[in-house]
Amino acid sequence: MKVLVTGSSGFIGQALVRRLRAEHCDVVGLDKVPAETTDIVCDILDANGLTKAVAGTAPDAVVHLAARIDLDEKTDLSGYTANIEGVANLVEAVRRTPSVRRAIWTSSQLVCRIGYVPANDTDYKADTLYGQSKVRTEEIVRSADGAGREWCLARPTTVWGPGMSAHYQRFLHMIERGHYFHVGHGPLWKSYSYIENIAFQYWRLLSVPTDQIHRRTFYLADYTPIDLIAWCDAFQSYFGSRPIPHLPAGVARTLALCGDAVNAIGLKRFPFNSFRLNNVLTQYQFDLAPTAAVCGPLPCDMQQGVAATVAWLRNLSAR
């Protein structure tokens, strides 16, 4: 199977290219940023260049990952053109390329605000411009019936593991240095996704029979939610750091308000505020049974993921 992966220089993209090559697929990576996993340097906003790239590759399948994924835009959707016009461009490019049999279109869990459980696939409750842009991604794909090919939508949750962004690296270094604290003592359940597991899930979505995926929407995450406290404690153990202390929720809220005040006077890098506290305390779990039924058992458990991530971070630090 020949697969075109857009966004092949990104976190998930690089892992997916490696997985597909390990499964003996013929993989072509496309991204606007050069990388070892990228064969074609092309911006998906360049409609003509994209159409030529897809037609020239003549893939059997397309996995669309290319997107702007930050939450920085606060004014309007114009900053997220890659998630709107870029998707429309790729839909048209796929439509014009007869070799393509299947396409997987990547959306996001943030088409709904964290903590909201949608009643159906088109029950949207985005509370960020990024999330709204991913709603448009889904609407474009649905309205075009996936460019007339076999298709499904994927909604990744929070993805972690080797290759993760500097933001998450800083978080883990806080644990390593003994600067992190738990809020309260109860479990905080999160549907997180380990990077090798989500790459495996994408491969399975490419491989299974049509009737198992066509016109469906899949949340992509580990099937068993992670308790944030247990997850952080696992990192602490592998780092060999001091045990993570537990701070009462009331004390944490007071500290967060102090952080808000510090941020308000211009010190944006203060490490704790109400936004981050809410991120910690908000639990979210998704029904992964449909995904598990299609994709099957995952290759890695949490402990394996933590061990691999710590080894990767130490290798980075040694360079």
Residue ranges and their predicted role:
Residues 3-23:
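N-terminal Rossmann NAD(P)H-binding glycine-rich loop of SDR-like oxidoreductase domains
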Residues 44-85, 96, 115-118:
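NAD(P)H-binding glycine-rich loop region in Rossmannoid oxidoreductase-like domains
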Residues 208-271, 306-310, 317:
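Mid/C-terminal beta-alpha module of Rossmann-like enzyme folds, strongest
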